[in-house]
Amino acid sequence: EDTVKEFQPEMVGISIRNLGNHSYIDPQWALPTSKEVIDKVRSLSSAKIVVGGPAFNFLPKECFSYMGPDLGIAGDGGETFAELADLLDSNNPYEHLSGLVYRENGEVVFNGVRARSGFAKPPRFEDLDMEKYTKAGFGIGVLTKLGDFSYPKPDSNGEVKEPDWRVIRPIDDVLSEVKEMEEKYGLRKVFFIDNGFNIPLNHAKALCHAFLEADLKLNWNTCMAPFSCDAEVVSLMKQAGCALVIMGALRGDLHDGETLGEKLEPLREVCAMCEEGDLHYTIAQSFGEVGETEQTVADKLAFLRSIKPAMANLRIGSPVLPGSPLVATAIKEGLIADESELIRPTIYVEEAVRDWIVDYMKEEAAKNPRWNLL
């Protein structure tokens, strides 16, 4: 409130990271808080309020209708946001911008074409309070690659081809950005924003080599895909300053295709490589997915007991996301009437385990201090 009064902005951007916390045990919806922020800013200022972010991107019109901003941007909105600011400043039309969501004659309008950003321009670090980032747990975020809001899918050889990535920043650009942070602000703690740092494998190795050749004394963390990995990249990441990698579980209907053991094997191999290379990792595992049984729950727990993560995040059920195959199941079982209701957190839990899975998992998690039940 004090900042808005003091700064008197003409435009305010609000990025919505998640629609909720993806917890079945303690579900929390994020949009009401975002709406409160919008209402508060509007009560203090005449600034144009623009919303965007990954969560907004799922259901742009529905989120816009609920929160009531002036404008919205769906997609990678960084560059479009800057262009919008210029157009507003010069009092020129802006409705043609890709990804724009706005209200016209009482109706919410979205042309269906999402904005895209190449992230060619570096962030304006000089406009940020960089001192705060030196105290942050993960440090400051630096973008390396962006996929399709999940792990890009490998082909039959385990390779992920370039078209699956929305953005792959040139290695020299990433290197220049982290060098500037170190030289100007003394910041060596970095989180590399990446759906899967280790894919494509050759790119990951080249980036690590660049860090080593530049003799950067970084302490960094990132996300790692639970496939397409080898001992060399783990070693290079460790040498280049990686302290921790975050791995999620491969999702999917347990009725489909591979057995659970076959699905878990690539993940088991990557965990073993990290342990042998002394690279700390966290892992996520879902329980109650489509096709879950008492036996698959037992098999997943046995797998978790066989590895040594710094932390294992255990989730009950699967978030029902717009456009996912789970939408039809959620409608059929009466969880939602239609997809527009998914602006609220909706978690699907397999009927075969639904009655007992929560209490059982609470008991199991209590036995292991490194298991965190969400």
Predicted regions and their residues:
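Catalytic cores of alpha/beta
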Residues: 60-67, 233, 290-306
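Non-cysteine beta-strand/loop elements that form the S-adenosyl-L-methionine
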Residues: 13-16, 77, 234-253, 312-319
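Radical SAM [4Fe-4S] cluster-binding motif and immediate context
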Residues: 121-281, 287, 302
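Acidic, low-complexity intrinsically disordered segments
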Residues: 1-179, 184-186
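Charged helix-capping and loop-helix junction motifs
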Residues: 27-36, 205-206, 261-266, 296-300
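Short, solvent-exposed turn/loop segments enriched in Gly/Ser/Thr/Pro and often Arg
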Residues: 53, 195-200, 225-226, 288, ...
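Short aromatic-enriched loop/helix-cap "lid" or pocket-rim segments at secondary-structure transitions
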Residues: 113-115, 122, 204, 233, ...
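C-terminal accessory regions of radical SAM enzymes
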Residues: 99-104, 108, 134-139, 280, ...
